[in-house]
């Protein structure tokens, strides 16, 4: 009875075998060639062997063709599904396991055949319904099955075996006609994968989610994505589905490829330096994720698919977008192996990268920003070379930090604002005398990446070496006051340069050189300035005292109304005696007379006239003076002195005596 049912089935479905055995089976056996992995034929030896065996059996007996056709169709379905999930982890072929799977499948098929004898009409009707359902199934439902099968996979590197994926609706048991329908379904599924990168972009994106069973809503696009990289060889092991929304790549396109291939050439050195510095930190801190983080900015390549740019992919230039990468080093979980082989430390380290796109800070041209706009810092040396740039400057200026470091900051100032910057740096040098002093300068224009200028307000601080008194670096905390004319700061700058006359260029060059020379000068100490100020004030005070004493002495001389005579000064040891003779005239005021004399001993001088004055001095020398005063009448006054044999001392002024004391 079993053979009769099989014979009737084979007779009724012989036409479907002839029509679909050549073309549909060929497309089904080479489904991996159209899946995006270079068009290589499938490496599944088991499925191809089963197809060849079925062709041989068909030429011999139709009776055996029934069982062989069922076994081949079901084996191709299940083996391809199993190898798609397990083939990525296999590094060596396992033919014995595949044979066991085939034997088990054949035994299950034979058991099912006994149950189909009593329900052959119902099975045929059910088979027809399944074929109709598979023929009318939408493309999004098949993609949903692909996504479910991929969700089971963990971190393995993809292989060509994993490409031959059978949608869930094409599974199940059936006859030879169902095997032909399965081959045609695989051919349709290959056409789905052959639809190009434009179709692949929508498979893991919003389109696949919205075209599902209707129970799930449209997925919200994410602004960032994450990926896991093996530190052993730099291969990408896992990416989040949001990479399609951010960069346009299909989710699986990064798997098995080096991450640095997607980084811009100018940023690869920065990426490598961050990795080399981050690994020792992770090892020293025990690879704790929260303690081994670092952040930097790079340019990542965007996908050139048919959906984003249409045809002619080769002729279009490669576009890059700025991203802020957060690095976290982790150790991969240990895997149990049958040979009890333990992985050494360091070989199982993983790198988790979270990439966030950086957008421009400006919405409209020439935008006036508020006082609450974020600040960013730029530090440069005394020679004007930029040594540090804050990552917050990327969205405001369009430059990555590595693009500015090592360049002269003078090249970014507007040529009409160089005179303002010269005054600013003069103030920087003056404020450098006091540690921690800061000031705000006038607004000035700064060149950004797209060739436009922004208006900056800056708070300046500086650091002076306390030993050499040389300026080490200048820090500017900038805030954008007015935005550029072009909102997108990441666009390429125009090739044409601003035309400036030769005279203006020479003047600008001279101003830049003057600024650099001024920054190279020695900064005076605050104590030296105080000493100079005190010394200047002391000199002014001494000059004032001398002038005051001169005025006092002149006032004393003008108090008499007649002639006056002054005697010399006599010094004995440390005592100073002054004698003066004043003559008074009745008729008028007399003049003054002076005289000098030398001698030793003691002498007294007396002047006679209308009035008398007496002066007595004792010392080693005697001075003699004669004064004559005239008015309406004539009066004379004389002073006599005695002379001795000793030498007279030089006269001493009042100011000198005060200074001597």
Curated annotation (Swiss-Prot):
Entry superkingdom: Eukaryota
Q: Where is the composition biased (Basic residues)?
A: 53-66
Keyword match Kinase: no
The record's subcellular location field reads:
Nucleus; Cytoplasm, Perinuclear region
- Give any single GO term for biological process: circadian regulation of gene expression
Which residues fall in a compositionally biased region of kind Low complexity?
1-34, 635-646
Composition-biased stretches, type Basic and acidic residues, lie in 108-120
Q: What keywords would UniProt list here?
A: Biological rhythms, Cytoplasm, Nucleus, Phosphoprotein, Repeat
Q: Where is this motif: Nuclear localization signal?
A: 53-66
What Gene Ontology cellular-component terms does the record carry? nucleus; perinuclear region of cytoplasm
Q: Where is the composition biased (Gly residues)?
A: 588-634
Please list the GO terms describing molecular function: transcription cis-regulatory region binding; transcription corepressor binding
Please list the residue ranges covered by the sequence repeats.
591-592, 593-594, 595-596, 597-598, 599-600, 601-602, 603-604, 605-606, 607-608, 609-610, 611-612, 613-614, 615-616, 617-618, 619-620, 621-622, 623-624, 625-626, 627-628, 629-630, 631-632, 633-634, 635-636, 637-638
The record places domain PAS at 223-358, 376-482
Kindly provide the PTM information from the record: Phosphorylated with a circadian rhythmicity, probably by the double-time protein (dbt). Phosphorylation could be implicated in the stability of per monomer and in the formation of heterodimer per-tim.
Do you know which CDD domains this protein is assigned to? PAS (cd00130)
Annotated stretches, region: Disordered: 1-151, 582-661
Region (24 X 2 AA approximate tandem repeats of G-[TN]) residue spans: 591-638
Q: Tell me, how does this one assemble?
A: Forms a heterodimer with timeless (TIM); the complex then translocates into the nucleus.
Its annotated function is as follows: Essential for biological clock functions. Determines the period length of circadian and ultradian rhythms; an increase in PER dosage leads to shortened circadian rhythms and a decrease leads to lengthened circadian rhythms. Essential for the circadian rhythmicity of locomotor activity, eclosion behavior, and for the rhythmic component of the male courtship song that originates in the thoracic nervous system. The biological cycle depends on the rhythmic formation and nuclear localization of the TIM-PER complex. Light induces the degradation of TIM, which promotes elimination of PER.
Give the comment on domains. Answer: The run of Gly-Thr is implicated in the maintenance of circadian period at different temperatures. Deletion of the repeat leads to a shortening of the courtship song cycle period, and thus could be important for determining features of species-specific mating behavior.
Name of the protein: Period circadian protein
> Which organism does this record belong to?
Drosophila sechellia (Fruit fly)
């Amino acid at each position: 009875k079993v053979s009769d049912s099989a014979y009737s089935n084979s007779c009724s479905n012989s036409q479907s075998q002839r029509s679909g055995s050549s073309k549909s089976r060929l497309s089904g056996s080479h489904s991996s060639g159209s899946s995006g992995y270079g068009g290589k034929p499938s490496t599944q030896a088991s499925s191809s062997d089963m197809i060849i065996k079925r062709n041989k059996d068909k030429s011999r007996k139709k009776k055996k063709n029934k069982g062989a056709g069922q076994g081949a169709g079901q084996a191709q379905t299940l083996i391809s599904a199993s190898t798609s999930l397990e083939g990525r982890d296999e590094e060596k072929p396992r033919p014995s396991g595949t044979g066991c799977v085939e034997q088990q499948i054949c035994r299950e098929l034979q058991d099912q055949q006994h149950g189909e004898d009593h329900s052959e009409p119902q099975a045929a009707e059910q088979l027809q319904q399944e074929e109709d359902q598979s023929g009318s199934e939408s493309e999004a439902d098949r993609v949903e099955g692909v996504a479910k099968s991929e969700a089971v996979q963990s971190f393995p590197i993809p292989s060509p075996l994993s490409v031959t994926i059978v949608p869930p609706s094409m599974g199940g048991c059936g006859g030879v006609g169902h095997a032909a329908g399965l081959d045609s379904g695989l051919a349709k599924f290959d056409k789905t994968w052959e639809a190009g990168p434009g179709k692949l972009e929508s498979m893991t994106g919003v389109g696949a989610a919205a075209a599902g069973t209707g129970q799930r809503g449209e997925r919200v696009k994410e602004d960032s994505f994450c990926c896991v990289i093996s530190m052993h060889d730099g291969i990408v092991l896992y990416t989040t589905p949001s990479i399609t929304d951010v960069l346009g790549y299909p989710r699986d396109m990064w798997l098995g490829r080096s991450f640095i291939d997607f980084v811009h050439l100018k940023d690869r050195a920065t990426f490598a330096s961050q990795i080399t510095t981050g690994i020792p930190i992770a090892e020293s801190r025990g690879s704790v994720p929260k303690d081994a983080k670092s952040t930097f900015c790079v340019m990542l390549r965007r996908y050139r698919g048919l959906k984003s740019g249409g045809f002619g992919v080769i002729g279009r230039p490669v576009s890059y977008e700025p991203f802020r990468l957060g690095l976290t080093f982790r150790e991969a979980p240990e895997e149990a192996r049958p040979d009890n082989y333990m992985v050494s430390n360091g070989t199982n380290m993983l790198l988790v990268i979270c990439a966030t796109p950086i957008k421009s800070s400006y919405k409209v041209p020439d935008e006036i920003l508020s006082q609450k706009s974020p600040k960013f810092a730029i530090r440069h040396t005394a020679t004007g070379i930029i040594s540090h740039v804050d990552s917050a400057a990327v969205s405001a200026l369009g430059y990555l930090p590595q693009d500015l470091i090592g360049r002269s900051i003078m090249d970014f100032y507007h040529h009409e604002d160089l005179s303002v910057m010269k005054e600013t740096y003069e103030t920087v040098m003056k404020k450098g005398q006091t540690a921690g002093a800061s000031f705000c300068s006038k607004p000035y224009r700064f060149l950004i990446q797209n060739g436009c200028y922004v208006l900056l307000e800056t708070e300046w601080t500086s650091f002076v070496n306390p030993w050499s008194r040389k300026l080490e670096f200048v820090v500017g905390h900038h805030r954008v006051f007015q935005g550029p004319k072009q909102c997108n700061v990441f666009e390429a700058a125009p090739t044409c340069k601003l035309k400036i006359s030769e005279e203006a260029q020479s003047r600008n060059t001279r101003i830049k050189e003057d600024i650099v020379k001024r920054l190279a000068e020695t900064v005076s100490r605050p104590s030296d300035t105080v000493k100079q100020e005190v010394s200047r004030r002391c000199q002014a005070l001494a000059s004032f005292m001398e002038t005051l004493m001169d005025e006092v002495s002149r006032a004393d001389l003008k108090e008499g109304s007649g002639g006056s005579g002054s005697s010399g000064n006599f010094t004995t040891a440390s005592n100073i005696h002054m004698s003066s003779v004043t003559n008074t005239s009745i008729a008028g005021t007399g003049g003054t007379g002076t005289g000098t004399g030398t001698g030793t001993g003691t002498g007294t001088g007396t002047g006679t006239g209308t009035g008398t004055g007496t002066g007595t001095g004792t010392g080693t020398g005697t001075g003699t003076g004669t004064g004559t005063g005239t008015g309406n009448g004539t009066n004379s006054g004389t002073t006599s002195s005695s002379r001795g044999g000793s030498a007279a001392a030089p006269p001493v002024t009042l100011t000198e005596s005060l200074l001597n004391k």
